[in-house]
A protein has these predicted regions:
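A short acidic-to-branched-hydrophobic micro-motif
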Residues: 75-106
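Sec/Tat-exported extracytoplasmic proteins
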Residues: 67, 104, 108-119, 190-197
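Signature of long, low-cysteine stretches enriched in small and polar/charged residues
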Residues: 109-161
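N-terminal targeting sequences that direct proteins away from the cytosol to non-cytosolic compartments
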Residues: 19-85, 149-150, 162, 169-198
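Short amphipathic beta-strand and strand-loop transition segments with alternating hydrophobic
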Residues: 67, 88-91, 124-131
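Bacterial N-terminal signal peptides
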Residues: 9-17
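A mature extracytoplasmic/lumenal domain signature
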Residues: 61-63, 82, 90-92, 104, ...
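Bacterial N-terminal signal peptides that target proteins for export
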Residues: 1-8
Length: 198
């Protein structure tokens, strides 16, 4: 009996310091917004930062800026030899403009609802992600296609800032990704778009 009491006392003596320290231990898992403008070494290793007015966005390092591809493309256009297409454009927002949510909903309808007069290839999957960078809200619409578009993926990030709506279109092929680049990194690249406060 005496031995049991001694062991119990010893156990309590060891447990008390551990319990007192437990209140000082922070949780192992921290929920943070990884697209909130902080330094990201992995993303910096594969991307360069470009600007379109105050809009700050990333493109792949080996991308070449092209101009005048078609007369109806405005903004800045970048391409890689692997077929990754990056396009940033903007337009003014006025009282007659749809809200950000309605704009993204229309983009989804345009891509997923077949038109009776036009033969369309519809995506096999689509999704919407909400992004918040430094207090500026964006919506990312993602579309995955199958054959005959050869596993193409389109991402469209739409952001309202002051009186302008910005669009970042990213297009790539899932079976022809640039060497060492994953789909998750391309998604992170487009979602990292933010605004310079210079």
């Amino acid at each position: 009996m005496k031995r049991c009491i001694t062991l119990l006392s010893l156990g309590l003596c060891l447990a008390v310091p551990m319990l007192s320290q437990a209140s000082d231990i922070n949780p192992v898992i921290h929920v943070t917004n990884v697209h909130n403008g902080q330094y990201d070494a992995a993303l910096d290793a594969i991307t360069d930062i470009k600007f379109y007015g105050p809009y700050q966005f990333r493109v792949l390092k080996n991308a070449i800026e092209t101009q005048g591809e078609t007369k109806d493309i405005d903004g800045r256009v970048f391409r890689t030899s692997d077929g990754v297409f990056m396009h940033v454009k903007a337009r003014s927002i006025d009282n007659g403009s749809a809200s950000l949510d309605k704009e993204v909903k229309k983009i989804i309808e345009d891509r997923t609802v077949p038109e009776p007069t036009v033969k369309m290839v519809l995506p096999i999957k689509h999704d919407v992600i909400e992004v918040n960078n430094d207090g500026v809200r964006s919506l990312l619409a993602e579309f995955m296609y199958g054959w005959p578009l050869h596993n193409r993926t389109d991402m469209v990030l739409v952001t309202d800032y002051e009186d302008t709506r910005y669009y970042y279109n990213l297009q790539f092929y899932r079976d022809k990704l640039p060497e060492g680049v994953r789909i998750e990194q391309l998604r992170q690249m487009i979602m990292d778009a933010q605004f310079s406060y210079k």
